Every structure is written in C-alpha cells, then in structure tokens.
Amino acid sequence: MLKASNSKQTSKFYDLEERTYKFAKNCRNFVKKLPRTISNIEYGKQLIRSSGSQAANYIEANEALSKKDFVHRIKICKKEVKESRLWLRLCNISNSNTTRKEQKKLIEESIELTKIFGAIVGKSK
C-alpha cells in the first residue's frame, strides 16, 4: 500500500490490489449494459477476461517468489490492461450518454493503470 496524503483527519491509502479489482468489476458491470450485438458479446467476453487477468496477475505478483517473477507478472498486468483498453474502445455503445461516460472513465483508468504498472517495472529493474 502506498500512502497518498498525510492529513491530520484522514490518511488516504492507495491499495493497488483493490484498484485492479474495482477495474475488473467495473468492466464486468459495463459489459452488462452494452447492447446485445454479436460484436459486443465477443468484445465483452474478451474485456471481462483481460480485466480480470490484470487483477489476478497483480495478486500473483505480490506473492512472487523472486524479483524476476514479480517483474514478469507486473508486465503481464500492463499487457492485460492495454488489451482491456482495446476491447473497451471496440465496444459499440449506441446512443447512451451514461454508458459512453462510463466507457470513457474505464479507458482513463486503464491508461492510469498502464502507467502505474510501467513505473513499477521501471523501478524494479
């Protein structure tokens, strides 16, 4: 866990394991709202797999037996988040502004997670 602020009243902690879990959960909930087209069904399945994989691999990275294994798992996390972004971009959301905003928010989160995982890899070398 990384400590984000040191205010007197509240200390905010960033738990990356929780953040990756929420990203996967939010992607799953997003898929449930998509129009049921053939392409959305397939893209949705891929999105659920890749977003879940980044969360699972982050948990595995935290249990790594070696630094090499840790870095490898984090690289997989980064790859899976980038893949999730592709599937998010490919989903056809029709005219729903709410779903469009949710899609944009998830894409932004995937960009942030990609940067975080990239920084972890860079600092671990």
Regions of interest found by a model, annotated:
Residues 1-125:
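Amphipathic alpha-helical assembly/interaction segments
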